[in-house]
Amino acid sequence: MIELKSGLLVSKIRNGTVIDHIPAGRALAVLKILGIKGIEGYRIALVMNAESSKMGRKDILKIEDREIEEKEAELITLIAPEATINIIKDYEVVGKRKQEIPQEVVGLLRCTNPSCITNNDVEAITRFRTLKRRPLQLACEYCETRLTEDEVVRQILG
């Protein structure tokens, strides 16, 4: 539930997903990860730059009649590590999960090194290990090329 001092800003959803604690300005990137363009028929509430005692400012997404898949949650975690994913059934939170940035990211991102084997062998699957969680820094297992958080966000946004 998103509340203002004067009351409710966005109504509750009956069934679906609420993603809270998204860093301010990244909710549109989360929608892109989910492949939501606005024509799918989902009712979506998007709040950007909401006040947050924990984060200063944050974004919030409510998506009615849609649950987040594990692979989507992993990608969301890479650009919104503090995000909380709430599953809603009959207006109640029935599941709440906070993803951890994985130790290894497999097949989700591409290596930026044009000489890397993953860019020259169609069967090679990208594999990055997490070097730092904040700010995010990943290293390619094959060529050691490093990806920063900004590069990860750029790749996800395509």
From Swiss-Prot:
UniProt GO BP: 'de novo' pyrimidine nucleobase biosynthetic process; pyrimidine nucleotide biosynthetic process
Gene Ontology CC entries for this record: aspartate carbamoyltransferase complex
Gene3D superfamilies: Aspartate carbamoyltransferase regulatory subunit, C-terminal domain, Aspartate carbamoyltransferase regulatory subunit, N-terminal domain
Signal peptide segment: none
Cofactor, how bound (note): Binds 1 zinc ion per subunit.
A GO molecular-function annotation: metal ion binding
The entry's keywords: Metal-binding, Pyrimidine biosynthesis, Zinc
Obligatory cofactor(s): Zn(2+)
Coiled-coil intervals, chain numbering: none
Residues the record lists as binding Zn(2+): C111, C116, C140, C143
Subunit relationships: Contains catalytic and regulatory chains.
Family named by the database record: Belongs to the PyrI family.
Function: Involved in allosteric regulation of aspartate carbamoyltransferase.
Classification via HAMAP family: Asp_carb_tr_reg (MF_00002)
Protein name: Aspartate carbamoyltransferase regulatory chain
Organism: Metallosphaera sedula (strain ATCC 51363 / DSM 5348 / JCM 9185 / NBRC 15509 / TH2)
Lineage, uppermost ranks: Archaea, Thermoproteota, Thermoprotei, Sulfolobales, Sulfolobaceae
Gene name in the database record: pyrI
